C-alpha cells in the first residue's frame, strides 16, 4: 500500500512513516517513477572519458565519501594493470575516448597503479587522477614515478586533489584531523615539480559559488599553485551525495522544465570500470556514482556495455533510476570529469 492509499483508508499514520513509504517507492521501476510518469534516460553519445576504479581502499575515512572509501573498505578490489590495460586497448580501438580517469579509494595505494598510469599515457590519452595527495602519493618511489612520467608526457597528466574547503577547519570536518597540512604538502610538491594539478572542493558549506571560488583563489595565490579558480575544470566544486534523498525523480518532462539536456549528463560521455571483491573479471558501469548497485552493470567490455538492454538500460542508454542521478547530476549539475 502506498502513502496515498494509507491516507485514503483513513488511517492515522505519523508523518515520518508516510515520508518513509513515499521514499521507498521512488527509484524502483526502471521505466516509471513513483508518480507513474515516464522515467528519463540518457544515451551514450560518445565515450569521451573512461573511468577506472583502482579499488576502494583509502588511507583515510571521510565523513561523507560517496563511495565509502576507507582503510578497511575493499568492496571494490584492486584493479590489476593487466585488467586495466585490456580496457585501455579497447578504448583506443574504439577511437572515441580522449581521457582516462583514475579514481578510488586512493589510486596511489594500488601496487600496480604506476604501471596502468604509464600505459594510459603511453597510448596517447589525457589522464586525470583523483587523489588526496597525502602519504600514499608522497612515498619516494611514487614521487620518482610521477617525475619520470611528467618528464615524458607533460601536459597529458593532471592530478586533481581533494581539498574540501579553503580553510583547515572545514576541510578537516570532512577529512579528519591532521589531513590539511599533509594535503597542502602534496599539492605544493606537485606544483613545485610542474605536474598538472586541479582542485576538487565541496558545496556543502552553505556558500555561494563566488564566495567559494574567492576563498580558494586566496589560498591558491598564497601557495603559487598554477590553478585558475574561475576555470570549472581546474577548480571543481562538487554537490553532495545524500543517502536519504527525497527529492523528485527525473522524468522525460524534466529536461524542458530544468532547461537541461541529456547530453549534459555524465553518462552521455563516460563509463566506469570496477572490479568487485571476489569477482573473476571487472565490469562496466554507467558512471562513477553507482559503484555498488549491481543492477547497473552493463557488461564485461565496453562493446557489451554499448549494447546493454533491459532493466536499467535501453540499447546502451541509461535509465535514471537512482537518487544520485537526480541529486548529483541532473539537479546538482555535478560531473566527475
Regions of interest found by a model, annotated:
Residues 1-13:
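Intrinsically disordered, serine/threonine/proline
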Residues 2, 18, 26, 297, ...:
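Intrinsic disorder/low-complexity detector
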Residues 10-103, 108-118, 123-126:
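Conserved alpha-helical substructure of the radical SAM core
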Residues 72-86, 107-151, 159, 163-185, ...:
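Canonical radical SAM enzyme core domain
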Residues 95-101, 153-163, 178-247:
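Conserved C-terminal portion of the radical SAM core fold
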Residues 221, 239-337:
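Accessory C-terminal segments flanking Radical SAM cores
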Amino acid at each position: 500500500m502506498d502513502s496515498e492509499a494509507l491516507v485514503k483508508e483513513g488511517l492515522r499514520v505519523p508523518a515520518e512513516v508516510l515520508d518513509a513509504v513515499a521514499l521507498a517507492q521512488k527509484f524502483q521501476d526502471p521505466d516509471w517513477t513513483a508518480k507513474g510518469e515516464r522515467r528519463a534516460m540518457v544515451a551514450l553519445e560518445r565515450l569521451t572519458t573512461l573511468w577506472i576504479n583502482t579499488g576502494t581502499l583509502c588511507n583515510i575515512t571521510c565523513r561523507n565519501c560517496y563511495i565509502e572509501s576507507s582503510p578497511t573498505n575493499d568492496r571494490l578490489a584492486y584493479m590489476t594493470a593487466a585488467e586495466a590495460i585490456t580496457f585501455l586497448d579497447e578504448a583506443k580501438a574504439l577511437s572515441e575516448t580522449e581521457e582516462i580517469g583514475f579514481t578510488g579509494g586512493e589510486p596511489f595505494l594500488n601496487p600496480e597503479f604506476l604501471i596502468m598510469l604509464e600505459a594510459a599515457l603511453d597510448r596517447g590519452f589525457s589522464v586525470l587522477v583523483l587523489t588526496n595527495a597525502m602519504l600514499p602519493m608522497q612515498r619516494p618511489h611514487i614521487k620518482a614515478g610521477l617525475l619520470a612520467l611528467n618528464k615524458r608526457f607533460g601536459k597529458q597528466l593532471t592530478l586533481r586533489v581533494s581539498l574540501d574547503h579553503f580553510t583547515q577547519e572545514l576541510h578537516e570536518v570532512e577529512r579528519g584531523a591532521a589531513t590539511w597540512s599533509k594535503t597542502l604538502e602534496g599539492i605544493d610538491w606537485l606544483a613545485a615539480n610542474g605536474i598538472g594539478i586541479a582542485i576538487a572542493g565541496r558545496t556543502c558549506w552553505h556558500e555561494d559559488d563566488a564566495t567559494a571560488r574567492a576563498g580558494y583563489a586566496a589560498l591558491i595565490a598564497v601557495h603559487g599553485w598554477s590553478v585558475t579558480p574561475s576555470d570549472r575544470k581546474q577548480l571543481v566544486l562538487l554537490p553532495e551525495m545524500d543517502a536519504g534523498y527525497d527529492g523528485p525523480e527525473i522524468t522525460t518532462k524534466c529536461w524542458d522544465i530544468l532547461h537541461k539536456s541529456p547530453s549534459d549528463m555524465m553518462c552521455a560521455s563516460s563509463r566506469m570500470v570496477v572490479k568487485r571483491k571476489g569477482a573473476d573479471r571487472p565490469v562496466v558501469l554507467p558512471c562513477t556514482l553507482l559503484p555498488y548497485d549491481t543492477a547497473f552493470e552493463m557488461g564485461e567490455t565496453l562493446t557489451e556495455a554499448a549494447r546493454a538492454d533491459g532493466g536499467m538500460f535501453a540499447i546502451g542508454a541509461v535509465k535514471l533510476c537512482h537518487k544520485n542521478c537526480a541529486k548529483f547530476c541532473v539537479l546538482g549539475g555535478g560531473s566527475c570529469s
